[in-house]
Amino acid sequence: KTSMKTFGKSVTDKFPTTRIFDIQYEQLGATEFNSKLLGEKFEQGRIDDHNRLKIAFNLPFYVSNSKRFILTSSLRYKYESYAFDNRETNTLSGPFPNEKEDFHYFAGAISATYMSKLFNKPIIYNATTTIDGNQENIQRIKGFVSATLVLKKTASTTITIGALVMMDPSSIIPITPLFTYNHKFKNSTWDIDFILPQRLLFRRDLFENGRFSLGTELNSENFYLNLKAKPLTGIYELNQLELKSGITYEHRFSAKVHGLFKVGINNIINTRITERGERTTKYVYEHKENPQAYFRLGISYNPF
């Protein structure tokens, strides 16, 4: 049986950043890069150090008597740091003028989730509004709505379909189909966790309180830049799409405290900078990076 409680546990189990409190540190290995500015070859060199610190806080502040409607508030903070070396550039000033660059990203969101039935099957609706920015100011308001229909739920298999609609003029794909498939193999400790378009993982319990995963995940990153040197002046946004392949180990220190360790190879699909609010197809700067090793450490707290 699917209830709001079981649905919520499924989400927090798969995505640590949706738990009450989560903190993660990610270190990316050194890599070579080359870039274009305003369509022209611009700069090449080496990223010696690239790391991220992320903190997430989520708190349900209203639950209806029927337990079918929940309002949740969320706060996000990210610190991202780059260190460059061996740079070869032309005379134009680009988005990363210094050898070391630091960025701060903040976001706050309100999310409404409602569970009902469609064709006698559970369906979960969600609407989320987000305000984000950097240390300079609030920069944008955006949001999305989604619907997820549970097609099948048994002891070994869960299948859902749905759609996500972005309320964001800069979105390249305003409507995204959603599909999830989780299946525990018969007479096996392994299960498959597939979420379109985000991940494909093969998982198994390990030791008494651990879980091991092997697979690939698609992640996106963004932050804002306040640029003051021509040809780029004003507020811009960096968007990066990454494909991470490797292994994950999760450990339950207690029923409420969970640890995370990930290691593998990070492939940057693209890194683009646009004017704030513009679609990423209208980028003014892009750069390519070679594949790099990475690791991530995290710890989260979830009392529910």
Predicted regions and their residues:
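Outer-membrane beta-barrel translocator/channel fold
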Residues: 30-44, 195-295
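Repeated loop/turn-to-beta-strand initiation elements of outer-membrane beta-barrel proteins
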Residues: 64-69, 117-124, 156-161, 188-191, ...
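Transmembrane beta-barrel domains of bacterial outer-membrane proteins
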Residues: 2-152, 236-239
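Transmembrane beta-strands of outer-membrane beta-barrel pores
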Residues: 25-31, 75-83, 116, 129-135, ...
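Outer-membrane beta-barrel strand-turn architecture
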Residues: 15, 61-65, 116-119, 151-155, ...
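Outer-membrane beta-barrel "beta-signal"
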Residues: 178-182, 288-304
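Solvent-exposed loop/turn segments connecting transmembrane beta-strands
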Residues: 102, 133-142, 165-175, 189-200, ...
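Membrane-embedded beta-strand positions of outer-membrane beta-barrel proteins
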Residues: 21-23, 71-75, 110, 125-127, ...
